[in-house]
Swiss-Prot record:
UniProt topological domain (Cytoplasmic) ranges: 254-268, 325-331, 401-431, 493-541
Domain of life: Eukaryota
GO biological process assignments: intracellular protein transport; positive regulation of Wnt protein secretion; positive regulation of Wnt signaling pathway; Wnt protein secretion; Wnt signaling pathway
UniProt function note: Required for a subset of Wnt-dependent developmental processes, in particular, eye and pronephros development. Regulates the secretion of wnt4, which is required for eye development.
Family per record: Belongs to the wntless family.
Keyword Transmembrane: yes
Transmembrane segments: 233-253, 269-289, 304-324, 332-352, 380-400, 432-452, 472-492
Keywords attached to this entry: Cytoplasmic vesicle, Developmental protein, Golgi apparatus, Membrane, Signal, Transmembrane, Transmembrane helix, Wnt signaling pathway
Signal peptide limits: 1-28
UniProt cross-references to InterPro entries, sorted A to Z: WLS-like_TM (IPR047843), WLS_GOLD (IPR053936), Wntless (IPR009551)
Protein location: Golgi apparatus membrane; Cytoplasmic vesicle membrane
PANTHER family reported for this sequence: INTEGRAL MEMBRANE PROTEIN GPR177, PROTEIN WNTLESS HOMOLOG
Designated name of the protein: Protein wntless homolog A
Length: 541
């Protein structure tokens, strides 16, 4: 009989494969931990307070904080008051990056947040639920001698969340508030070398614009971007892993098509998982180095979503097809109760992502976190997603427990077998349990990775919650996905070896009782694998 490679491989060879995969997994972690720098970096320039007394503030003149033609600036708002300069004539100008540096397409994205330094004054304090109005213009250029070109401009409102750590008394005047960072904009590509931000805080008492926001002392324009060195390591991993998965996927499907039977459900799902892994591996990001593809962040989220959906569905089907409860499954329709919610959840994630990053393709200043309702919905989504992920993990653990329990029940039939048959099935069950444990470990690590990335993307805090994810964790989990898919397609591919009764001539052969108990009657040489026969889930031919 022709079974899967995992059923015919000796324990010694299986251990060798396991050690090789483990070494590659350790290598994936070391690549991130020792070679790659931290995934993200940031620059935090303090915006220069430029004076622009022109009547038409909307004209095309850009105010530079430094350079050959720096703007006329002031040191503080006290100086502005002494010189009778109105607040509407003050422009916060910030150049990214700092002088003598350049931005690069290797940075992949740029997230910009604002940090306000606000001093407490008894006659000018921050009111409750105050909003700050920002008149923002962003320009770019690729040469220091070029004229600035407008990238985007908008008038945005952001909620001001500040806490004064001391009592509001006269003695504490001048103490600074502790304020949350204000999300400003996000760019899906960094295709230019220099960026200039001109930000006004227009005051309009009639419209209540920028009234009750305290005494602003300074404004920090914090720019967060992916490290170029990490991008190179990440691209190199993708470039190396893509052909590896494609080759094993072609080899796997070729072995299946050479058989006289049609593929069973588990084999189809494993191939689909390999295809989704290939889709996420293909390093199309190389093109973003030469082209201004602002949609790459959204495209990356879609690829990850497809892989997550396929991976979660595979684990459910993998456990169900090995339940050993004599229930005929082998059809995707049997799992609609489990796979349906995964598909629904994936669609919800896609809609949420389109509402955030989809809109940012047209308006980079848009953020769902800028309003109370949007922030509450987004936070609720993250909490619900985390809860659903944990519930899914618990349900998966329960299914694994059922599989192990049913296997233990089947093991009671082993003493009645011949020695050769008993050793064969004991090895088969051991290898299956080993693969189930590895699956459970991968599921746990994937859930942790999902929750961690969701929390970090949702907040981008500079304080309590670090904006940086561990490089070793990124590369290690990514390598784990690829090694897991590679191992599945290799171990569950049909074997060229044949296992029959002639292989155990020293025993009396398998009795009819054994065949009835374990449902392993051989119909033809290319029949379902022994795991499928043991589970009682043969393909309908």
């Amino acid at each position: 009989m022709a079974g899967a490679i995992i059923e015919n491989m000796s324990t010694k060879k299986l251990c060798m494969v396991g050690v090789a995969l483990l070494l590659l997994q350790v290598l994936a972690f070391l690549v991130g931990g020792l070679i790659a720098p931290k995934p993200t970096s940031y620059v935090n320039p303090v915006a220069m307070k430029c004076v622009d007394v022109r009547k038409n503030h909307r004209s095309s003149k850009w105010l530079m904080p430094w350079g050959t033609e720096p703007c006329k600036s002031i040191q503080s708002f006290d100086e502005a008051a002494n010189r009778m300069i109105e607040a509407n004539d003050i422009v916060f100008a910030a150049h990214i990056p700092n002088s003598q540096f350049e931005m690069s397409p290797w940075f992949q994205f740029m997230l910009v947040v604002l940090q306000l330094d606000i001093a407490f004054k008894l006659n000018n304090y921050i009111e409750e639920n105050s909003m700050v109005t920002l008149d923002v213009s962003v320009a770019y250029r690729d040469d220091l001698k070029e004229e600035w070109k407008e990238l985007a401009s908008s008038v945005e409102q952001r909620k001001l969340n500040c806490i004064l750590p001391v009592e509001k008394t006269l003695a504490n005047e001048g103490r600074h508030y502790d304020c949350d960072v204000i999300p400003l904009m996000e760019l899906g590509s960094v295709s230019h070398k220099y960026y200039l931000f001109n930000i006004r805080l227009p005051v309009n008492e009639r419209k209540k614009a920028n009234i009750g926001i305290g005494e602003i002392r300074d404004l920090h324009v914090v720019s967060i971007f992916q490290n170029g060195g990490f991008t190179m390591v990440w691209f190199a991993m993708k470039t190396f892993l893509t052909p590896s998965i494609i080759i094993i996927m072609i080899w796997y499907w070729r072995r299946i098509t050479m058989m006289t039977r049609s593929p069973v459900l588990l084999e189809k799902v494993i191939f689909a998982l390999g295809f989704s892994m290939t889709f996420i591996n293909i390093p199309v990001e190389w093109f973003s180095i030469g082209y201004d593809w602002t949609w790459m962040l959204l495209f990356g989220d879609i690829r990850q979503g497809i892989f997550y959906a396929m991976l979660l569905s595979f684990w459910i089907i993998f456990c169900g097809e090995h339940m050993m409860d004599q229930t005929e499954r082998n059809r995707i329709s049997v799992y609609w109760k489990q796979v349906g919610p995964i598909a629904f959840g994936s669609c919800c994630l896609f809609i949420f992502d389109m509402c955030e990053r989809g809109v940012q393709l047209k308006n980079p200043f848009y953020s769902i976190w800028t309003t109370d309702v949007g922030a509450e919905i987004a936070m609720a989504f993250i909490i619900v997603a985390g809860i659903c992920a944990c519930l899914y993990f618990l349900f998966l653990c329960f299914m694994v427990y059922q599989v192990f329990r049913n296997i233990s029940g089947k093991q009671s039939n082993l003493p009645a077998m011949t020695k050769a048959r008993r050793l064969h099935y004991e090895g088969l069950i051991f290898r299956f349990k080993f693969l189930m444990i590895i699956t459970l470990a991968c599921a746990a690590l994937t859930i942790v990775f999902f929750i961690t990335t969701q929390i970090t993307e949702g907040n981008w805090k500079l304080g309590d919650l670090s904006i940086e994810l561990n490089s070793a964790f990124f590369t290690g989990v990514y390598g784990m996905w690829n090694l897991y898919v590679f191992a599945l397609m290799f171990l569950y591919a049909p074997s060229h070896k044949h296992y029959g009764d002639g292989q155990s001539n020293d025993g009396a052969g398998m009795s009819s009782g054994e065949e009835l108990q374990l449902t392993t009657t051989i119909t033809h040489i290319d029949g379902p694998t022994e795991v499928y026969r043991l589970a009682g889930k043969e393909a309908q031919e």
